[in-house]
């Protein structure tokens, strides 16, 4: 296994935040609605991990270090893990497993549908993030995994729809996402190694 310490560091960071938030909830440090706080934090954590994942390719081009690419799949799976936990928090703490209420929520809060579409995209990416799928799909695998850009757009839209008024935090995430997209424009991507010199 290449770069085991780097992989271990990412694993520790990925585990650390949910464990810490659980501790805060157990100690009554998250206020009167800890379930919602945890749900929100997990959603932002997933978006953060997604942006970090998308930064791996530009970082590799800038530095020439292959370690960034090696951990990209691991980071992507953490995005999926955080989103699954985000959804579970919603189902248990917000919805109370009241499936009849779900239809009402979808009508009242269409941003949930946007989030669900993003989750489906992540599910496809997570299921196919393995060597078997790469061999099976061949050239189509790369095309399929461009779905991550749509997932980012859906995630940002979901976030924007929720915050509505105070857009400062959202704007930071959107700006970073926009920069990462610009760095993928072929002419810009080709120039990155030259900038590193």
From Swiss-Prot:
The keyword Heme applies. It comes from Pseudomonas putida (strain ATCC 47054 / DSM 6125 / CFBP 8728 / NCIMB 11950 / KT2440). The keyword Glycosyltransferase does not apply. The chain crosses the membrane at residues 10-30, 42-62, 75-95, 110-130, 147-167, 169-189. Its main location: membrane. Keywords: Cell inner membrane, Cell membrane, Electron transport, Flavoprotein, FMN, Heme, Iron, Membrane, Metal-binding, Transmembrane, Transmembrane helix, Transport. GO terms for molecular function: electron transfer activity; FMN binding; heme binding; metal ion binding; oxidoreductase activity, acting on diphenols and related substances as donors. Part of the MsrPQ system that repairs oxidized periplasmic proteins containing methionine sulfoxide residues (Met-O), using respiratory chain electrons. Thus protects these proteins from oxidative-stress damage caused by reactive species of oxygen and chlorine generated by the host defense mechanisms. MsrPQ is essential for the maintenance of envelope integrity under bleach stress, rescuing a wide series of structurally unrelated periplasmic proteins from methionine oxidation. Signal peptide: none annotated. GO terms for biological process: protein repair. Belongs to the MsrQ family. This is Protein-methionine-sulfoxide reductase heme-binding subunit MsrQ. It is a multi-pass membrane protein. Heterodimer of a catalytic subunit (MsrP) and a heme-binding subunit (MsrQ). Pfam families: Ferric_reduct. It is found in: Cell inner membrane. One of its GO terms (cellular component) is plasma membrane. Binds 1 FMN per subunit. Its cofactor is FMN; heme b. Coiled coil: none annotated.
């Amino acid at each position: 296994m290449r770069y085991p310490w780097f992989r271990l560091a990412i694993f520790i960071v990925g585990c650390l935040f949910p464990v810490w938030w659980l501790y805060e909830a157990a100690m009554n440090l998250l206020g009167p609605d800890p379930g919602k706080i945890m749900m929100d934090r997990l959603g932002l954590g997933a978006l953060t991990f997604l942006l970090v994942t998308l930064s791996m390719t530009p970082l590799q081009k800038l530095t020439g270090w292959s370690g960034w690419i090696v951990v990209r799949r691991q980071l992507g799976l953490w995005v999926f893990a955080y989103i699954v936990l985000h959804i579970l928090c919603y189902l248990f703490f917000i919805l109370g497993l009241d499936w009849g209420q779900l239809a009402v929520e979808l009508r009242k809060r269409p941003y949930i549908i946007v989030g669900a579409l993003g989750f489906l995209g992540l599910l496809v990416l997570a299921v196919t993030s393995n060597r078997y799928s790469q061999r099976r799909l061949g050239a189509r695998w790369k095309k399929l995994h461009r779905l991550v850009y749509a997932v980012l757009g859906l995630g940002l839209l979901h976030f924007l729809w929720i915050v509505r008024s105070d857009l400062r935090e959202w704007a930071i995430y959107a700006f970073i996402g926009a920069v990462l997209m610009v760095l993928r424009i072929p002419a810009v991507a080709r120039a990155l190694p030259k900038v590193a010199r």
